[in-house]
């Protein structure tokens, strides 16, 4: 996804794709599965990827590949969003930014091949940097199974989960450990995020369409009564209707990307003010970069005992200067707006 000055919005859609297209060397934008880390060193540690409320490891939700044209230090640039899988803790959200120059220690200077490479069918549990990844979630794994010394984990919780789901039997079979990674029912379903530019619709056209829809359904009501009804329309109704009108042409969109534009909100409640968005540690302001839409929830299959993680809008704000970080990851800011009981 190309990041530029405020302009047309890019819409993201979830589509199935072969696993090799979602690996790090392909610089993907994707939902679910394990993170396709960009920088392969100095990954966020377990402390940075733990829910602030319940302490459980966060699950990888999605990543967006968003290089900055004209910036040599951000020729490659990705944003990684994580969330807590526990429905009552869905506030546990963290987002990280990583960027690399074209000439770097991890990837070829030339664009990646468009064909599948050999050996890409196995789960990657160790990066080129030597860093080990958790067998359950694909995040940095400083813990090691004390018995086989070959299985690595981000936390005691994930080690226990893997032990219960098969590592207990595989632990003594050293030649099979890397090839026997069970389904831990922790990762979200994996999809590629494909993008297209949003069709430009003039605000006047949208307003006229909304007006026509309303007047068409209320054709017999006197003008004075319509004026009275309009005065009673709440700000909440107006914002929600604007949200619906904005997504009506592409109702399957799961993501809206536009660095420096304004997000669209689903509710008049809990809209952040400038003071609510913390500055980057470098001193620069943070600006809006993308938002995750509630339509993504349909793809996640996150229901558990009748409960599910939920949101209205997840809005991600990043450093306006996209400050240089070497090969490390820096945390950015995400704002969660819930769905209210809007008619």
From Swiss-Prot:
Domain of life, source organism: Eukaryota
Residue ranges covered by zinc fingers (MYND-type): 134-171
Listed Gene3D superfamilies: 6.10.140.2220
Gene Ontology molecular function terms on file: DNA binding; zinc ion binding
SUPFAM superfamilies cross-referenced by the UniProt entry: HIT/MYND zinc finger-like (SSF144232)
Binding sites annotated in the UniProt record for Zn(2+) 2: 145, 148, 167, 171
Transmembrane segments: none
Post-translational note: Ubiquitinated by PRKN, promoting proteasomal degradation.
Keywords: Apoptosis, DNA-binding, Metal-binding, Nucleus, Ubl conjugation, Zinc, Zinc-finger
Localization: Nucleus
Name of the protein this chain belongs to: Programmed cell death protein 2
Native source organism of the sequence: Mus musculus (Mouse)
């Amino acid at each position: 996804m190309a990041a530029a000055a405020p302009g047309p919005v890019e819409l993201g859609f979830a589509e199935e794709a072969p696993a090799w297209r979602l690996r790090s060397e392909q610089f993907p934008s994707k939902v679910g599965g394990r993170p396709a880390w960009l920088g392969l060193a100095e990954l966020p540690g377990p402390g940075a990827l733990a829910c602030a409320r319940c302490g459980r490891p966060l699950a990888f939700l999605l990543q967006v590949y968003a290089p900055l044209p004209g910036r040599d230090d951000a020729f490659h640039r990705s944003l990684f969003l994580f969330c807590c899988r526990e429905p009552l803790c869905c506030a546990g959200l963290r987002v990280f930014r990583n960027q690399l120059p074209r000439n770097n220690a991890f990837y070829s200077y030339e664009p990646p091949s468009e064909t599948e490479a050999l050996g890409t069918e196995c789960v990657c549990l160790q990066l080129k940097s030597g860093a080990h990844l958790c067998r359950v979630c694909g995040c940095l794994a400083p813990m090691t199974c004390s018995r086989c010394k070959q299985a690595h984990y981000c936390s005691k919780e994930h080690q226990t989960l893997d032990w219960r789901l098969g590592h207990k039997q595989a632990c003594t079979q050293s030649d099979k450990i890397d090839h026997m990674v069970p389904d831990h029912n922790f990762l979200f379903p994996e999809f590629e995020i494909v993008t297209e530019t949003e069709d430009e619709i003039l605000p006047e056209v949208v307003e006229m369409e909304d007006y026509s829809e309303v007047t068409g359904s209320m054709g017999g009501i006197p003008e004075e009564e319509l004026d009275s009804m309009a005065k009673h329309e709440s700000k909440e109704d107006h914002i929600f209707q604007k949200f619906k009108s904005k997504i009506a042409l592409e109702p399957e969109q799961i993501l809206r990307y536009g660095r420096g534009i304004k997000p669209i909100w689903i509710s008049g409640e809990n809209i952040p003010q400038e003071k609510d968005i913390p500055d980057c540690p470098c001193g620069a302001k943070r600006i809006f970069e993308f938002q995750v839409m509630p339509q993504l929830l349909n793809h996640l299959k996150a229901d558990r005992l009748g409960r599910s993680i939920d949101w209205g809008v997840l809005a991600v704000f990043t450093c306006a200067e996209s400050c240089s970080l070497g090969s490390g990851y820096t945390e950015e800011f995400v704002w969660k707006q819930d769905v209210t009981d809007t008619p």
